[in-house]
Amino acid sequence: MTDVKKNENMTFEEAMKGLESIVSKLEEGDVPLEQAINYFQEGMALSKMCHEKLQKVEKQMDFILKEDGELAPFSVQEEDEGDK
């Protein structure tokens, strides 16, 4: 099991792989209760880490360069259901 506190500098992708591994182990259903709780706690920490990294990237993407070189808020346009 990975020590999340020691891996605060792990990448988003590494954290997601850790989450996938934990989910896989828990889905097997052959995990003692105490170990399942530890996996759950680690998964929650990894999930929080991923969420924080995504929020940071979202803030970075909130500003993009306009044609005149000024920073402007970035807005995502939702796809219409008919466009799919």
From Swiss-Prot:
CC per GO annotation: cytosol; exodeoxyribonuclease VII complex
Main location: cytoplasm
The protein's Enzyme Commission number: 3.1.11.6
Sample GO molecular function, one term: exodeoxyribonuclease VII activity
Gene Ontology biological process terms, A to Z: DNA catabolic process
Enzyme class: hydrolase
Pfam families reported for this sequence: Exonuc_VII_S
SUPFAM superfamilies associated with the record: XseB-like
Subcellular location(s) of the protein: Cytoplasm
Subunit structure: Heterooligomer composed of large and small subunits.
NCBIfam families, sorted: PRK14063.1, xseB
UniProt similarity note: Belongs to the XseB family.
Name the UniProt record assigns to this protein: Exodeoxyribonuclease 7 small subunit
Organism encoding this protein: Bacillus subtilis (strain 168)
